[in-house]
Amino acid sequence: MPEDEIIERAREDEREGKLPSTQAGEFVRDEMEHIREGEHGARSPQQAIAIGLSKARRAGVKLPPPKRGKASTRTRKQAKRDLAKGRKGRGKKPSRKRSRATKRALKREGRSAASRKALSRQARSAARRRSAASRSRAAKKAARTRKKRG
């Protein structure tokens, strides 16, 4: 379960009118921090990001599932499930056996998924997949919604 301060930071982003992807970024950043601190590992930066996005959706961030063709059917279905979980609020307590199994599986993975080199490679490949217009639009919005200094 994500810490309360992460959820609070995401809520603050929402109040400031930032996109759900920015709100979800708080959870992804937190996940990277967990890997760096050695709490658990991840097979790749993509897996670490996916875990963060899943936690964000379950915490109530209104991040829509990826569009058809952008991600696998399984990923899209899981994102839909996470979103529904986030809308419904916490149901029954998660199974202890499952939680321990996932935790142990992640503990066996390496820590290099959150290294500067791996994240830089991931960021570059993600940027390459976007059009110039999309990148420009995002930069303009970032400048518009950036916190004012002072």
Report each predicted region and the residues it spans.
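A charge-rich, low-complexity, intrinsically flexible signal that marks solvent-exposed coils, linkers
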Residues: M1-G150
